[in-house]
């Protein structure tokens, strides 16, 4: 009888231990399920400049290099840089969960700032050119521009063709390292049809025109309209010097950020945000 009782007690203990072991298995599975559910968050693209999908020059920020003397694309209202590029950049930053910070600098420093990683994007009504593509990558185009010619109202230059006429010898004012500079250097200066005076700001070139130091100014059409509206005695020729595409300059060494910015830009173009921003500043 004692043997039977001992055997029954042993069996009870075995079942009890098995039951306890069974309780532990679901607990472990629950813990594993929780970890798996959190994994996508840690691996998802994090727009914070951290170690996730992409990095930025400053964690949590999108640094935009610009030259804020280019209305209506970028210019100052008080101490704040506003304009088409500023608003598009802000919309991109918002999509990426970043804070936009604008760094105003000389135009010819923008490409180097982007190339060297001091800025994440370069926006300054920047035209895509083969020369610039050697240093930086460009996103999809978000706007088109036209190079226009500003002259005094009594100028003997009546069309762009006059700049290329046989025996022409005009002094052309441009903003240094802009496409106006590039185009006129190749088409006028290198061809022996005149000289190019280069200025750090478009406004300085326009002032040189007003005071007679240059015969005309070649500059993007939208700032040209703004300058002519501000300065009496100037006009824009009816014929354009050249047409071009504006895009965002980015480093060749940050593919992940490039893809994120370009994807955000595409979405903003597709949903009409970019066009709405352009229309806000430019009347067709």
Model features per residue range: what roles?
Residues 16-32:
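Bacterial lipoprotein signal-peptidase II cleavage site
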Residues 35, 48-125:
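Extracytoplasmic small-molecule ligand-binding "clamshell" domains
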Residues 49-54, 179-197, 232-238, 265-284:
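Ligand-binding clefts/hinges and TM-proximal coupling segments of bilobed small-molecule sensing domains
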Residues 68, 144-153, 221, 225-266, ...:
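Periplasmic-binding protein-like
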Residues 71, 81-92, 146-203, 221-222:
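Bilobed "Venus flytrap"/periplasmic-binding protein-like clamshell domains
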Residues 86-95, 154-155, 161, 167, ...:
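Extended ligand-binding regions for polar small-molecule ligands
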Residues 90, 94, 99-163, 240:
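Acidic, polar ligand-binding/catalytic clefts
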Residues 108-109, 126-134, 185-186, 208-211, ...:
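A ligand-binding cleft/hinge motif common to bilobed small-molecule-binding domains
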């Amino acid at each position: 009888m004692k043997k039977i009782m001992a055997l029954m007690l042993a069996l009870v203990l075995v079942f009890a231990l098995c039951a306890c072991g069974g309780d532990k298995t679901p607990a472990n599975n629950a813990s594993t399920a929780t970890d798996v559910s959190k994994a996508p968050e840690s691996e998802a693209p994090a727009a914070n400049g951290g170690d996730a999908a992409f990095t930025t020059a400053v964690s949590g920020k999108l640094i935009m290099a610009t030259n804020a003397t280019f209305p209506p694309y970028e210019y100052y209202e008080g101490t704040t840089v506003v304009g088409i590029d500023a608003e598009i950049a802000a919309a991109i930053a918002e999509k990426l969960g970043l804070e936009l910070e604008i760094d105003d600098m000389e135009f010819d420093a923008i490409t180097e700032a982007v190339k060297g990683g001091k800025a994440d994007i370069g926006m300054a009504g920047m035209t895509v050119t083969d020369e610039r593509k050697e240093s930086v990558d460009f996103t999809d185009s978000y706007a088109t521009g036209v190079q226009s010619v500003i002259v005094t109202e009594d100028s003997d230059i009546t069309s762009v063709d006059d700049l290329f006429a046989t025996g022409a010898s005009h002094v052309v004012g441009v903003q240094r390292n802009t496409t106006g500079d590039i185009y006129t250097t190749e088409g006028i200066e290198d061809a022996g049809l005149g000289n190019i005076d280069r200025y750090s700001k478009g406004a300085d070139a326009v002032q040189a025109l007003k005071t007679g130091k240059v015969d005309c100014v070649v500059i993007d059409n939208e700032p040209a309209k703004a300058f002519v509206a501000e300065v009496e005695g100037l006009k824009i020729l009816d014929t354009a010097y050249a047409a071009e595409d504006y895009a965002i300059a980015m480093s060749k060494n940050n593919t992940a950020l490039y893809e994120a910015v370009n994807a955000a830009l595409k979405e903003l173009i597709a949903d009409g945000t970019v066009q709405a921003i352009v229309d806000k500043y430019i009347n067709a």
